[in-house]
Amino acid sequence: MGNESNDQMFFEDLILLDKDFQNTNQFFDFTFPILKSGGYVNHSFLEAIKQRESSFPTALPTEPYVVAMPHTDVEHVIRPFIFFTRAKGTIPWREMANNDHVLKANFVFLLGFNQKDGHIDLLQKLMSCFVNSRFLEELYHAKTEHEIFTLLTSNINL
């Protein structure tokens, strides 16, 4: 397995750069086999994440780049992870606070929690990074998975 951080949420092999996705379902269909084969999620994860995203969209109107952070219930996750994706172009993603509004997501932080109460603190830490336009610019311009891994682990203290 690739580099892991001490907090065991970020993994270099769960960083995807510049892949083209037409919609959220295509994104989930692509990432699910990676997560399943890596032992991160159960077979039920794919359907659960699609249903949850449909009911509770997760795109945030952050600037200068839009961030989505989909997640689902803990019973679908075997071990915790954050799967970071920088899209090639953007992915149409429904806004968290306004389900009828579709944003163009640049980044996806696909979150896997396996403890019921552990996610609130993580979400707050992520949100505080997402309002930092310098951090988002660095993610956008990073050249390699390792550079992204270093940015994530040095800016998001889990």
Model-derived regions: residue spans:
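Cytosolic covalent-transfer regions centered on His/Cys nucleophiles
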Residues: 1-158
